[in-house]
Amino acid sequence: VNQHSLLIMVDHSKINLTLSQDFYDRFNEVIVVDHHRRDDDFPENAVLTFIESGASSACELVTELLQFQGAPERLSKIQASILMAGIMLDTKNFSTRVTSRTFDVASYLRSLGSDSGEIQMISATDFDEYRRINELIIAGERITDDIIVATGDNHKCYNNVVIAKAADTMLAMAGIEATFVVARTSH
């Protein structure tokens, strides 16, 4: 990293969600690409901001940027598969927050060779992660007929992916309109 280096923050716009505050502080200029609304803790040194809260996922936005940049290099099959996996994750396999733009981007990625077998491998949950997700689900309690609140073990730390997957799994259950998962993280 030098004074000409550029940090690109993707799928978040909060400085405290970067991997490391020390790492973030090493950059003078930042680009933000996100599909969440701009919030507090936004970088003051952003030289470019591409925030589209109507987009299905950050992968959709990244693909659009790459698709229309006009560079002669094309995405590889694995790169196309990774971006497609991200879109499929955020849209729950094209069932929520999908727009015509989402399908246009998916079609473009498919034309580049995104592979469903690769996507399955990328998206697979390992056994230990699956157990942690289910631990949170089992801890869930209905506070009303359509709302579930789950609380993690206070002596354990859970990562954000496990927490989100537990909440999404419960939200997909019949009759459930809202889920809340409260758990300790390493942050």
Regions picked out by a protein language model, each given a short descriptive name:
Residues 22-27, 105-108:
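Catalytic-core regions built around general acid/base machinery
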Residues 5-8, 29-31, 178:
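Structural motif
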Residues 1-4, 92-187:
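Hydrophobic helix-and-loop "lid/oligomerization" segment in the mid-to-C-terminal part
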Residues 2, 22-25, 42-43, 75-77, ...:
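Solvent-exposed alpha-helices and their adjacent loops that cap or buttress functional pockets
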Residues 35-106:
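Short alpha-helices
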Residues 1-25:
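N-terminal small/polar loop signature for handling phosphorylated ligands or for N-terminal nucleophile
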Residues 12-15, 36-38, 154-155:
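Short glycine-rich anion-binding loops that position phosphate/pyrophosphate groups of nucleotides
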Residues 17-19, 41, 96-97, 159:
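Short helix/loop capping segments that flank catalytic or ligand/cofactor-binding pockets
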